[in-house]
């Protein structure tokens, strides 16, 4: 089957924003204007098409990135048909994992900002993630019809808070109630949308007289930004004092894809103005899969290899999202980087070392689906019938292996015990939890050996609350949930230069003999665990060395202070001995475990607690109270900024243990007028009095 849309006309984009910037409404309008759905969904009444999980519709927040395909021929029908794959990303901090995983497979992003609130804490998180994956982006200032809307203020914030380089492509005509349209700085014409047709019709007109001066000033900046793309254009600009429309668009496209600038637009999605021009900008300035460098990976021997976005290349794709669907079962969303995949094909998963057969292939629209026969390079689609794939894994050609760079998933910082309410729920709960953990790598499930309880861990209170809720709705499991617990860690502060572990059992016949001498050293934060084999002269035979490493690794999940996982430790095996008859792997595992535990005791073990970056936006009257409260929670206030339009943003670093129930507390302190976001920053040593309490509580 030949390609319907050339790859140059693909755009894989994400719509990303702070919680209330109006991202879902913006996405809805995109789907409406591209002719996908004919009744506009509104988030307020819970009918938005992209928010297809029940909890999202109840809470009015977007949790899962649904992927949707739409087609666009331009606002004035002046482009050949382009295919836009939209990945909807969540705007809540507990779901940064979702943002992160969608950034990994995007080619470009539209960052939506509120014209009143401007750049908010979550906007910075999302911006950092887009930087990390080098995603070209454009900015859309939404809610221009709201009281206090100010496009140019948001422009200043993008420069100061995000250190972005925004280049307005349009400027607003009016603001608040009088916002009627935009001045297109490329065409130097006014665009006024027709309200009766819900913005599907528009007309170009002359720039209003009172805006001519402002429009000329911003047009000048736009042309300068374009001219800076090459010496040739700069010379042309200097000679003629101007550039034509094609020159400007080609130059801005080059600079946007290179990450040097971010085209900036504005409108009000709710009132059907401006989104249409933003879609044109997506086509004009954001990259197609062919514009971005070939994807990097490794072959079976670990050598670097590349695959370019071409149907003729061997197949490679990344599974970036798993979902349970009530009708078809498990759906795996994949981004195809190279080659072609047909239903019925067999593919290889290099991480699991397994082959899988592809069942049906689906092209998703927010909550309905179209069955397709094949997917091509650059496509995003859903596969039915994969059994062993987890989020972040590669699928590739069975004869031409490639392992694409894996996604990084944060470690969970909060845990809760869950217990099924009845015997009937017991079996279903195990299945439900393993399915949810497969979908979401930042959610972990384990069973506590001492208490026999099932412990779930995640990125925040809301994250776990929603997963327990999904367990009830999707799997029919009723469960009781314990109090949230902090995920502490243990590490060492000093070296232990020599510690011995000896496991000897002499009984009639075959005994056990393992003897190791280790050196333990602390690693810098985030160092994890490192094992070094420094054995000389075969005092410990080669075949037992992996057993020593394994013995230590099996000891790591439960430290000696309070049974929390041990991190940031380097263990060096440098001496030992063995017995010709009695030595075996098990004996060396036991000896290593004994040595490691004793070594930790001698190396100043300490308890680490998760520290959270907290940002509170509050009216000025309550700023002192909020700061006092954060300090009383062992928080370190790191700064306070003014919010445009009044109020303060307070930044602090606070231990997670002190932040439970903070939302309720903050509401009562500020009469419900403050909001906050919180994300994991790093682990830090817990003060002695806190550590003593935690250790005592665990010892009970």
Swiss-Prot record:
InterPro entries in the cross-refs: EFG_II (IPR041095), EFG_III (IPR009022), EFG_III/V (IPR035647), EFG_IV (IPR047872), EFG_V (IPR035649), EFG_V-like (IPR000640), EFTu-like_2 (IPR004161), G_TR_CS (IPR031157)
- Keyword hit for GTP-binding: yes
What SUPFAM superfamilies does the database record attribute to this sequence?
Answer: EF-G C-terminal domain-like (SSF54980), P-loop containing nucleoside triphosphate hydrolases (SSF52540), Ribosomal protein S5 domain 2-like (SSF54211), Translation proteins (SSF50447)
Highest taxon of source: Bacteria
- Where does the tr-type G domain start and stop, copy by copy? 8-290
Q: Where is GTP annotated to bind?
A: 17-24, 88-92, 142-145
**What's a single GO MF annotation on this record?**
guanosine tetraphosphate binding
Q: Provide the family line.
A: Belongs to the TRAFAC class translation factor GTPase superfamily. Classic translation factor GTPase family. EF-G/EF-2 subfamily.
This chain belongs to the protein called Elongation factor G 1
Species assigned in the record: Bordetella bronchiseptica (strain ATCC BAA-588 / NCTC 13252 / RB50)
Please spell out the taxonomic lineage of the organism that makes this protein. Bacteria, Pseudomonadati, Pseudomonadota, Betaproteobacteria, Burkholderiales
Tell me what gene encodes this: fusA1
């Amino acid at each position: 089957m030949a390609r319907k849309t050339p790859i140059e006309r693909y755009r894989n984009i994400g719509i990303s924003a702070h919680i209330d910037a109006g991202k879902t409404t913006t996405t809805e309008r995109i789907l409406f204007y591209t002719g996908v759905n004919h009744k506009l969904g509104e988030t307020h009444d819970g009918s938005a098409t992209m928010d297809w999980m029940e909890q999202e519709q109840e809470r009015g927040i977007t949790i899962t990135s649904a992927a949707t395909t739409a087609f666009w021929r331009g606002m004035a029908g002046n482009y050949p048909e382009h295919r836009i794959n939209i990945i909807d990303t969540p705007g809540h901090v507990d779901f940064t994992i979702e943002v992160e995983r969608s950034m990994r497979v995007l080619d470009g992003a539209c960052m939506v900002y509120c014209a009143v609130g401007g750049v908010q804490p979550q906007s910075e998180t999302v911006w950092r993630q887009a930087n990390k994956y080098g995603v070209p982006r454009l900015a859309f200032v939404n809610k221009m019809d709201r009281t206090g809307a100010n496009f140019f203020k948001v422009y200043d914030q993008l420069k100061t808070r995000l250190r972005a380089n925004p280049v307005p492509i349009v400027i607003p005509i009016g603001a608040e109630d009088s916002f009627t349209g935009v001045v297109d700085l490329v065409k130097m014409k006014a665009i006024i949308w027709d309200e009766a047709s819900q913005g599907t019709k528009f007309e170009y007109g002359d720039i209003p007289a009172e805006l001519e001066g402002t429009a000329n000033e911003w047009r000048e900046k736009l042309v300068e930004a374009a001219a800076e793309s090459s010496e040739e254009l700069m010379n042309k600009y200097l000679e003629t004092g101007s550039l034509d429309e094609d020159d400007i668009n080609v130059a801005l496209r080059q600079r946007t894809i290179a990450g040097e600038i971010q085209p900036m637009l504005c409108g009000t999605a709710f009132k059907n103005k401006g989104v249409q021009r933003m879609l044109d900008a997506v086509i004009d300035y954001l990259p197609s899969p062919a514009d971005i460098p070939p994807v990097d990976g490794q072959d079976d021997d670990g050598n670097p290899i590349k695959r370019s976005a071409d149907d003729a290349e061997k197949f490679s794709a990344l599974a970036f999202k798993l979902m349970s669907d009530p009708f078809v079962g498990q759906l795996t969303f994949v981004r195809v980087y190279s080659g072609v995949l047909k239903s019925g094909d067999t593919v290889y998963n290099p991480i699991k070392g397994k082959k899988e057969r592809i069942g049906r292939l689906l092209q998703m629209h927010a909550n309905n689906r179209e069955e397709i026969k094949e997917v091509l390079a650059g496509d995003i689609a859903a596969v039915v019938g994969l059994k062993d794939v987890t989020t972040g894994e590669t699928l590739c050609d069975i004869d031409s292996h490639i392992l694409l760079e894996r996604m990084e998933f944060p470690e969970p910082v909060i845990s809760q015990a869950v217990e099924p309410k009845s015997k009937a729920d017991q079996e279903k709960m195990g299945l439900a939890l393993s399915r949810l953990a497969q979908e979401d790598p930042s959610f972990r499930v384990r069973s506590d050996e001492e208490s026999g309880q099932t412990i779930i861990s995640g990125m925040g209170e809301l994250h776990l609350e929603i997963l327990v809720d999904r367990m009830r709705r999707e799997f029919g499991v009723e469960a009781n949930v314990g109090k949230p617990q902090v995920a502490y860690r243990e590490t060492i502060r000093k070296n232990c230069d020599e510690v011995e572990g000896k496991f000897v059992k002499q009984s009639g016949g075959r005994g056990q003999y393992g003897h190791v001498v280790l050196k333990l050293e602390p690693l810098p934060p985030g160092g994890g665990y490192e094992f070094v084999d420094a054995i000389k002269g075969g005092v410990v035979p080669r075949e037992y060395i992996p057993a020593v490493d394994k013995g230590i690794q099996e000891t790591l999940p439960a430290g000696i202070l309070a049974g929390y996982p041990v991190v940031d430790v380097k263990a060096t095996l440098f001496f030992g001995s063995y017995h010709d008859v009695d030595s075996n792997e098990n004996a060396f595992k036991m000896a290593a475990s004994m040595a490691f535990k004793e070594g930790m005791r001698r190396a100043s073990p300490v308890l680490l607690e998760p520290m959270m970056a907290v940002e509170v936006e509050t009216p000025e009257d309550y700023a002192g109270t909020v700061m006092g409260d954060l300090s009383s929670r062992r928080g370190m206030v790191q700064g306070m900024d003014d919010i445009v339009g009044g109020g303060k943003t307070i930044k602090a670093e606070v231990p997670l243990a002190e932040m439970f129930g903070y939302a309720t507390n903050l509401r009562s302190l500020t009469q419900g007028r403050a909001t906050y976001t919180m994300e994991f920053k790093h682990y830090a040593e817990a003060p002695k009095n806190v550590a003593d309490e935690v250790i005592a509580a665990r010892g009970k």
